[in-house]
Regions:
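Conserved catalytic motifs of ABC-family nucleotide-binding domains
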Residues: 155
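ABC ATPase "signature
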Residues: 219-220
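Conserved ABC ATPase "signature" region
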Residues: 101, 105, 112-130
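Helical segment within the ABC ATPase nucleotide-binding domain
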Residues: 174-186
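Catalytic Walker B motif of ABC-type/P-loop ATPase nucleotide-binding domains
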Residues: 159-163
Length: 249
């Protein structure tokens, strides 16, 4: 398999913090993986993906994307990453269509291909009939779906999703997960997915890494982790390895 993301002994320590937010974390994400980074709230998931996106530097360790170091990887490598943040990054007084067209132009996209891309994703995610309504009128689940489309506009090689199904209704959650599975299967899109919902991630992810208090607990292919630990679920794997019930801090 071809390596897309190579994380080597990465740590992040904030000033005044009693412990490192991320401590000596190493993992590999191959092209085509649906990789779940799982852990309770406060485990270090958001800090990790913020470093991966280049929002701030590591305290120590190296991040490689397509073989380029985090410090020197090219503009093209940076553009290969799409991010869907946990916060809704949309303008409430613009329509879904206006939001997505504006964001597309910020990426340097234009023309009929941009319009077709937006229409396709809105249709697949069940939002075509509402695309000319202002975001302020959307439900939380609808906003999450538009947020996802924003991260897909430039057809990224790696799509990073930070808790994409938090606080959404069942219909929106199912629509998001099914669309992501389709993108992975048909386009080979690599997905990095953070969550503290182990059951959901077990069904969705091909590979899983569990972190807690900034440290790696275990990682591997989802089915192999369950089988090799003689467990029936990732929840049981976590309990067996740590001795603790998975908790939402």
């Amino acid at each position: 398999m071809s390596v897309l993301v190579d994380i080597q002994h990465v740590s992040k320590k904030y000033k005044e913090a009693p412990r490192a937010a991320v401590s000596d974390l190493s993992l590999i994400i191959n092209k085509g993986d649906i990789f779940g980074l799982l852990g309770p709230n406060g485990a270090g998931k958001t800090t990790f993906i913020s470093m991966l996106c280049g929002l701030f530097p590591t305290t120590s360790g190296e991040i490689y994307i397509n073989g380029h170091t985090h410090k020197t990887h090219s503009k093209e490598s940076k553009q290969a990453i799409g991010v869907v943040p946990q916060e809704i990054a949309l303008y409430p007084k613009l329509t879904a269509w206006e939001n997505l067209m504006f964001l597309g132009h910020m990426y340097g996209l234009k023309g009929q291909s941009l319009k077709d891309n937006i229409k396709y994703n809105l249709s697949v995610l069940g939002l075509e009939a509402n695309m000319h309504q202002k975001i302020i009128s959307y439900s939380g689940g609808m906003k999450r779906r538009v947020n996802l489309i924003a991260g897909l506009l430039h057809n990224p090689q790696l799509l990073i999703l930070d808790e994409p199904t938090v606080g959404v209704d069942v219909q929106s959650k199912q629509a998001i997960i099914e669309h992501l599975k389709k993108l992975n299967k048909e386009n080979g899109m690599t997905i990095l997915y953070t969550s503290h919902h182990l059951d959901e991630a077990e069904d969705f992810c091909t590979h899983i890494a569990i972190i807690d208090e900034g440290k790696l607990v275990t990682q591997g292919q989802t089915e192999a982790l369950i089988r090799e630990n003689n467990c029936n679920s990732i929840q049981e794997v976590y309990l067996k390895i740590t001795g603790n019930q998975f908790r939402d801090k």
